[in-house]
Each structure stands twice: as C-alpha cells, then as structure tokens.
Amino acid sequence: MNSILFLLGIAAASGLDAGAGYDENRDGGPTETPASDVSGDGAAGALSTADAKADAPAMGLLSGRVLTKGSRGAVPGAKLTATGTTGQRTTAESDDDGQFEMTLPCGAHALDVRAPGFEPLSLNRDACSNAAPLLIRLRARPNMPVYETIVVAPSDEPNLVLQRQELTTTPGSLGDPLRTIESLPGVATVAWPAPVYAIRGSNPGNTGYFLDDVQVPMLFHLALGPSVIHPYFFDSMAFYPGGYPAKYGRYVAGIVTAKTRAPAEDGLHASADVRLYDAGILVSAPWPDGKGSKEGKGGVTTAFRYSYTGALLSQIQHSVHLAYWDYQVRADRQVGEWRLSLLIMGSSDDLAYDLEAGSDKREYAIRFHRAGLRAGRALGKGRFSAQLTASADHSTAPIVQGYPITVDAYSVIPRAGYQHVTEHVDWEAGLDGQAQWFMPMAGVPMASTSDLALKRTALLAGAYGSAAIRAGSRLTLTPGLRFDSYTIGDTTRSDLGPRLAARLLLDDKTWLSLSGGRFSQAPSLAVQIPGAENFGLRLYGLQTSWQGAFGIGTRSIRSLEIEATGYLQRYVLTDMRDPTLKNHDPWSADFLVRRDARSYGLELMIRRPQTERVHGWISYTLARSERALGGGVLGPSDWDQRHILNAVLGYRVGSYTLGGRMHVNTGRPVLVRNDWDERFQRLPTFYQLDLRVERRMVFDAFTVDVYLEIVNATGTRTVLGLDQDPVTGQTTENSYRIVLPSLGIRAEL
C-alpha cells in the first residue's frame, strides 16, 4: 500500500497545486470586465499612441487548468474572477478540458474560482511574476457527489437509472454494480448469495442483459464470484422490469442495460483495487495524437481482474478447484464525421468439486468473448449508428446431475439505427439480427428428441420503430412496434409486438406513467447457460408475453421521491414439467413443457438521492406468480415470493460513509409428494443485514478508498430446498449459512 501511495505521490508532484485556503463569497466591487475585453499582448497595452503606451500598465497572461481534486478530471464551466488592487474585475470560464486564459495587468490579484458541486477556492496570483500555467484543484462538496443517481422515468420510456457512484457503493453489493439489481423493486433473488434473479414472476432465463447494446451471456462468475465486468468499467445502468424500448427484443420479461465509461481524453487515468477475493486494474488514456484536436480525438480504456481466492480455496479444500478472470477494452476515435467505438470483453470460469467422497467430479467451464465495433455520425437532422459484434462462447456444464454437455457457439450480431429529433416528435427506427452456430458435444445418447444437444444454426432478425410524441407540455406518448423472426434449424416462427409508453405530468412534481406491449423469445431453460439457448422451436414454439404497468410518482415531499407501480403480465413460457426432477433426462421431449403463466403485483419505491447526507431507498414488492399446471389447476411458480422488502441507507460523516441494507423475503414454494397426495410447501422467510463503512482520502492528484463490508451480518441460513425421505415422506431443510466479509482498498488517479 505504501508503495502505491509513493508512486501516486510522484505522479502528483509533476503538477503545481494552487494550494490556497477556501473563502466565502464576496459581494460588491466595481464593474466586471470579461477577459476577452481586456487589451494586452502580454507585455504592454496595445494602444494607438506612444503616450498611451507609456501610461498603460504592463499586462500578463494568466492561464492554466481547473481539475477535480483527487481524480485529475477536468472541471468544465468553472468561473474564475480576478480582482486587482484597484478593484477592477476580470472573468473567464474553463472550457471542456478545464483550460482557461485571462489577460491581467501586472500586480497582485485575488483569484476566486467557483463551479457547481465544488467548494469555492481563493488564492493570490501575479500574472507577470510567474508565467507558469496554474493548476487549480477544486474539492467536490461532501454532500454533492459528482455522479448523481437518477431514479426518474424519462419522458419517453419508464425505467430506473443508477449512475456510477451508487453502482459501486450500495451496501450488500460487495462493490459490484450488477448486484444492486437485487435491491430494486420487482426483483426476487432465488437463493442468496447465488446471483439468480426472477423479474416480476418470470423465469430467470427470460431477462436479458446488455452492455453497450451487446448481449452478455452471463452476469457473474461462478460460485460466489463478482460480475464478469470490472466494477469501474461501468458508467450507468438502466433497469426495465417490463415494457422495455422497441430497440431491444427477444426477451419476454425485462432487461438490464449498462453503459461503459468513455475513455479519458484529458490525460492518463488509472485505478487499482485489491479485495479479499481478487485484484483488478483499470487504465484510461487519450490517443497520443488526439489530445486537443477534433480529428483523432478519443481514447482507450482497459480493465483486467484476476481472482487469487481460487488458488487459496483449492489449497484449503482439495476437492474444490475454482479460478476466474475477465477483461474489457473500449477504444473511441473520431475519424472525420464518424465517431468509432470498439468494445472487447471476455470472461473465464473453471469450477470443479466432488459432491461427496468417492463420487465423480462435477466440472464447469464457462468462457465467452465479445468484440463489437460501433460507428455513429450526424446525418441530416438526426443521428445514424451501426454496430457489428462477433462472439465466441464455450461452456461445459451438467445441466442436471449425470448429463454434462460441452458447447461451442459462435455468433455474428449486426445492428443499425437512426434517431431523429424535432420540436414535438423524437423518432427512431432500426434493424438488428443474429446468426449463431452451435457445436455441442454431449455425454448423452444422440437419439434425443431435443435439438439442445445437436448441432444447429439459429438466424434471428428484427426491425423496430418508435416515436416519442410530446402532446403539449404535460403529456408524452411513445408508441412502438417491433417485428422479430426466428429460424432455428428447419423451423421458422415470427411475432409482431406493439408497445406503448405514456407519461402525464399532473404538476411540476407529480406524474402518472403507463407502459405495456407484447414481447417474444425463443425457447430457453429456466436459468441462462451460455450455449444452451435458441433451441426447441419446433417442439415448444415461441415464448410470448403481454405486459401492462401503471404508476404514480411524486417529488413533492421534502427531498423524497415516491413511486408506486402496479403490473399484470401473462406469459407462455417453457418450464420444467416436473419441479421435483424425477425425470433427469434434459434431452427428452417432456423435460420442458409449454405452459401458460401469469404474474401481478404492486411495487413501491421511496428514495432519497445520494446528493443528501442521509440517502438511500426503500423498495417493497407485493407479488404473485402462477403457472397453469393442467386440468384447469393454477399453482405458484418456482420463483414465487409474496413479499420482498429492501431498505438501503447511507450516511456521510466527513470523509466517512456508513451504510446498511436490510432485506426480507418470504419463502418460495416447493412441491412435496407422497403416494396419496402432493402439495406446495413454503420455505422459511429469509432476512439479512448488510453493513458497510468506507473512508475516502483525497490527495492532490489521486484518491484512496478503504472499505469494510459484511454481507449477511445476521448469519441467517439460506434454505435452498427440501429433501424428502422416500420411505417416510418426511422433509428436512437443505440449507447453508454464509457470511461474506469484504475488506478492500482502491486508489485512483
């Protein structure tokens, strides 16, 4: 740690710190003179006569940059006011790179620097005695983070957006942005700490995840691993529990879309983090020839993470082998009128363990790689963008015990769209598709009636259009239409999905929202497994859903934002026919079944933004998820949790942030059978308390964050299911207790 601080200190020493104290606003004084209106050539005033030159004061050029203290990020729009001994004021404003210039008479000047969200800074400076560029560092206000969380439905699409800072500091998430999903309304965690989520009563495999519009086949590393994307590679995340935009498709539940951080264009930035479980690094820098010019402007961001806990665990428990790593690269470049962006990412997991002494090992190996090139430019009065992504997946996993399958899958994914903005209507239209080749090698007889274990080709194509129509100052309507075509093997199916979103402002702080539509998806397993997708179209047909949601929200109560949403969704899904898994053959035609389903509920979100000293949210979900079991019988789905409550709280005290999360959910149903009866029995209610404390130390050119987090500090046991004695029929709980501590340190410059 000392060596990291020493190296960062050397980097910081290369710049000149303004280093002056802080001052309050000063009122009064003579008329301000903009810097551009002050005459001068750096030595004397440019007057037209010799006498005027003799009487004019000598002039000097004061220039420099305004940066964020602790991160070296540029502060655009900072207002600088220089007041001379005569009371004359000269003003300037920093540009997008934080740079500024002002011409001043020689002599002492009081320089006042202010920017929204930062503490004011005052210092004294003589433009003539020291011509070196001035480096000014502003400290962000403790109660005003630079990155604010927004949980507001925009005018055209209802959703929930989390920005960078909240993604990595939510208690219970272990600093992992994607784990914040489990604290949001409408989300049921199947069995903590496994990151498997059922959204609004659907199967976990019915929700899609996208990074910069590139579909990610899995969210998390195996076992208790983090997400497959470096946490500081994210910029924002949007959550659509239902009614998602028409530009996305092929999932019948909701989607999660994440955006990556744009590469730095103002200089080298780097961060390194070390945790109990792994270590990672992220480096971002501009192109060497692009700084300060439009042509070639852009940069590169790279991230890599490696887990060393697998090696430690393997040494402690010889029957377990665990290892994972991941990488991400984003490169942006301006080429003429085109903005190019290249995204490359990949992940690898290996897990092997013995179920019991003397038994065969269960082995998992999951790897995926994605490379996508996106190009965009202004075209007419709108913007055109095109993207081409190539992917390679490899999976070795026993879908059920005794039936391992190894699959290699390759894909080419094109996408193109056009957005047009006018005074009253914003519309967009586009095309997308996917060509996918599966080459499985299964350890089962190939006389299977399912094509999941067979070589196959999938060709998917979609077209969409939507328009945000502003009907006056209060009402926005967003109709949309999407067409999807699915060809798997020799079978083709298609679906037309109308969609509608609406938002009505009752006043400046209260609104009504509505969303709904039809969605489709190829058959899928209940839980996503890379390579085990796009199969069985001939046997099961398309999965479909009709969704509808209505909400009301307000910001009229102090600094709170409150929103309540009711929803109803009807599905046709591919489900496991027998939840007790008496039939263990995943290749048989009746392992999966086409089944009608229904879910409905109420979601409540009460939030105080992170700009407040006390911040956080409370989310509550009252839900019911049902499946048609045949013969007119409705039963609860495997993921049905009636009540889900999350309370997330953070409190800033100086450089410390204290946080906690309380989670409670009622149990899922489990089917219990004997010779004369079968019934659903609920698992026990699960609750947990998560605690987090973090300290941020801000130096001139870098920051250091040290944090301690304890997840499930209550030590509550997770009941995974029920084991039933085949003779007596008595049940016992299959449970475990896990407490996850995390101690970490992160340095960023």
Regions from the PLM with identified roles:
Residues 411-417, 454-464, 539-541, 547, ...:
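Outer membrane beta-barrel strand-and-loop segments of large Gram-negative receptors
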